[in-house]
Design a protein with these regions (language model features):
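Helix-loop-strand module that forms the ligand-binding subsite of alpha/beta enzymes
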Residues: 58-134
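N-terminal beta1-alpha1-beta2 submodule of the flavodoxin-like/Rossmannoid cofactor-binding fold
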Residues: 1-83, 89-93, 156-181
Length: 181
């Protein structure tokens, strides 16, 4: 089964790349699961301006980049969003990327790894509301890297974060397995 780890920031100098690197090192080999890192910055997605609702478009999109994004997301059985928190909410580029699609998200499990001044807790709670619209199954385990403690002078997660990540992956894989049947 495939878990898509979405690198959800496109800013220059983004912390998301450092978080993704740490996740790659700490997820390791997981029996029966492949973790694919999907970098939002690798897609030239337009602002959503479709003539129809993505949920009703049967995965047939007018834009080649949206189609490529759709295929990358559709191939996944579950997701981890690496998300910053901007102004107490979700990053616009990732929200736009989510809104551009529809059925590709439906019914799949999702977990969150946030970072920011408070560990992106407000962004993650906002993402949970958004995910519920797609009938996604959100994993309550989450990681929230706190800027003042873990991102001063580089990216230095506290030692217990690896254990938290393992618990998050265990639960996400459990959900993915049950949902896939």
């Amino acid at each position: 089964m495939k878990i898509g780890v979405i690198i959800g920031s496109i800013r220059n100098g983004r912390t998301a790349e450092k978080v993704a690197g740490w996740l790659k090192e700490n997820i390791g080999e997981r029996e029966g699961f492949e973790y694919e890192f999907i970098d939002l910055a690798d897609f030239e997605l337009p602002l959503y301006d479709g003539a129809g609702l993505p949920m009703l478009m049967n995965k047939q999109y007018d834009n080649d980049e949206v189609t490529r994004w759709s295929q990358a997301i559709d191939a996944c059985d579950g997701f981890i969003f690496i998300t910053p928190e901007y102004n107490h909410s979700v990053p616009a580029a990732l929200k736009n990327a989510v809104d551009t699609l529809g059925p590709e998200w439906v019914g799949k499990p999702i977990a969150f790894v946030g970072y920011g001044s408070l560990g992106a807790i407000r962004a993650v709670e906002h993402w949970r509301q958004i995910a519920s619209n797609f009938h996604m199954h959100d994993v309550r385990e989450q990681l929230g890297f706190i800027q003042a403690m873990e991102m001063r002078d580089g990216f230095n997660p506290m030692p217990h974060r690896a254990t938290e990540l393992a618990a998050l992956c265990d639960r996400l894989e459990e959900y993915a397995g049950k949902l896939r049947g």
